[in-house]
């Protein structure tokens, strides 16, 4: 016998050692324990029994092992039979899930006790190809689709869009409170929101009311943050991103606002950086902050040292992991609609992967790259481009169907109109780090960057091609301007010749196609790495709590690492191959270069967190952000291990949660311990530990994520 036919039809080499391992596991459950000679005898008997056959099914081997084991250890045979029955049941019911994955599935996405098959049918809409892709963990819609698709039939008002952007707040009291109302309504349907506050006049500007002067743009951030914290979204809080242009006179107060843990507790914040400011930083010159009050003509200006403001921004990121930076001119210049004079972005969504116009929204789904590796963990492992391109095309079709279904599920009429006019979708990827490990490629190496370019170009052209074919059938999106789209530098740089001809002939059905979301919850559900991120760590420590005895801590390996160790029969971390690297061992420049390679092919943006070590300096942060700008990123966030914001994930040789909280109390304004529950690094649902990755955060205990993508 030379090969074994797996249940999915794949032929794999026969491995006698795997039979020994399976038998040993069954024997370990008996009173006698493992008898290595018996395990070896059973494995050899299986090999000898099928000598004359070129290939044999996995079921035939297991049936034989069952009978052979009965001769040597009936008790072990019984355990083996029970194990097979349990695995069969799991295959029939769905994925094999950890407790955390079950919590995510049951509490976030499963509706009213539906079976796994019912869940698949509901989410796929009965599309067999999509349903199988989800089952095979090759494709996963975003959280709002998983949670809400089909529930309108039961009278539920749940949007299928993960994210929205509001119009910029106008400089008057009516607009400020209308915006709070828009936020509340959108949160009640399950959508997260982005909001730019750059049109609000700065502190000290004159107003025509009893106050005489305004408290400034920053003072209204807490109103929007409070609205976000009050409106629930099916067991989770709302999600909000607040932005301010770097040229606003209140920018220094904006950068500092999160130094007080009582301020803006329910929002992410980012600074919109323009090219002019970057040039001033590089040249070491002054930069003018400018605001003109539209209603009165009053001009407020302030000249600052550009490098001093850049340093303040870096220092706050070093200390508090916020604000993030958005390179706004690049965001505006690198997308399908960049040359359309009637189109403009108003802000970004809560995790910053989606720049959107006023009242814009986006439906999201992601392709799991790691499941497109053929013969993983072998010398002949390779990426299946044909299957990937087929999946990408199907993903575009799927998201267009979702977009149509969602028309009447948007919270606001303006959102419905914008969705119909622009037809923006967001197909992305996850499982990048897992894919590299399966291929034996080091994340950030030249080989990895080369492969990203190949996959990225394949992805954008598959998406453009399918969108053009949909336009052939149903017409281009209503705001389509052929001259502007064809003049887009993004289209000119990325569209293959045949795809460009299709666009010229039929137009595009969608004004936006690709994005890379943090995929925190859905990647955890599938058990793969999130977004474009490297794996966070090789292993982590889990705690089992006991009422009657001391709590116990035990080591759990990250999914892909455990899979590699099992396949390659590795028993110690020290023996892992060099290409298994984590956020703590990866050079930040390599991490930036990976994201830069992807950004070339992504017309929206990429949600990203660069995790850096504790010893990373403020000057290092400045260098990282400038390198990100120079490499062509649209935005980036950092998270420094041990920063004052308080990452309290317990790993080997780390301080306890109590110690971290105690330090946090001392470091930031002596805030009372009762207020620490609002710390973004402590889960607001269960008090567990939050991991920062992919431009978002996720609880390691209950799976809560403010992004829920």
Where is each model-derived feature located?
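Short Cys/His-rich micro-motifs in 6-15 aa windows
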Residues: 703-709
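Core structural elements
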Residues: 67, 93, 140, 144, ...
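Terminal amphipathic helices with adjacent charged low-complexity linkers/tails
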Residues: 74, 79-93, 273, 333, ...
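Internal maturation/activation junctions in enzymes
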Residues: 180, 292, 391-416, 420, ...
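Short cysteine-rich clusters marking metal-coordination/redox-active sites
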Residues: 683-686, 699-702
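Core nucleic-acid recognition elements
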Residues: 10-11, 32-136, 141
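Catalytic alpha/beta core of large soluble enzyme barrels
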Residues: 346, 351-355, 399, 403-406, ...
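Active-site cavity-forming subdomains of large catalytic enzyme subunits
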Residues: 161-385, 408-417, 463, 467-472, ...
